[in-house]
Amino acid sequence: FTANKPQIRRIIARRISKKERFNSVAYFRAHAEEIGRRLASDLREGTWRPKPCREKLIFDDLRDKWRHLKVPCLYDQCAHHAIMRQTIPDIMARKYYYDCGSVPKAGQSRAVDILRRKLKKKKPFKYALSMDVHHFFESLQAYVVIRALRKIYKDRRFLALHEIVLEGMGGVLAIGFYPSPWYANLVLGFLIDRF
């Protein structure tokens, strides 16, 4: 793991800029240097352990269903961002182009653009299929994600950090954790490669 203190400080600054209304933000702002130093050393030495996360039930008006969120504490969110900062380029390199999941530059807007382009061709297609895996995050076990990560990384300490993140989620991908959509897209990419 190679995140240095300036990178960690930038991650902390970004995280607290989006969460002005929480009490822990004032503490993080006042002690950003110390927290950044501690987080960098915890991640480098492998001593970081996530705290129990807050659980929340919200109603998603768009999908007309209830969602069970797990919200990690701010320190753990910064750790997730630091770990994923080094993982995301490798996931994006292996990502299936037509997988329009919830990651930047690959959401609904890309799906609509793809469909528009396909429909403009001279021979329009007769059928189209849009699929959504029912409760995909909750059904994706941690060992499957670790198996996919082992195909990319050989560094045991870095894999151990990912295992710790997955343990903090509760053994399955949790809605509300920053790494969850990235892990889901990684596993989908490997599944598509197999078939």
Stretches with model-predicted labels:
Residues 116-195:
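Conserved polymerase palm-domain catalytic core
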Residues 42-64, 78, 153-168:
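Reverse-transcriptase-like RNA-dependent polymerase core
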Residues 14-27, 59-70, 96-97:
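Glycine-/proline-rich flexible loop or hinge segments
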Residues 65-96, 137, 170-195:
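Conserved pre-motif C helix in the palm subdomain of viral-like polymerases
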Residues 1-42:
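Non-catalytic, polymerase-adjacent accessory regions of viral genome-replication enzymes
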Residues 24, 51-59, 94-100, 127-131, ...:
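Short coil/turn segments at secondary-structure boundaries
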Residues 80-141:
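Active-site-proximal segment of RNA-dependent polymerases
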Residues 6, 33, 37, 76-81, ...:
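Non-catalytic, well-ordered alpha-helical scaffold segments
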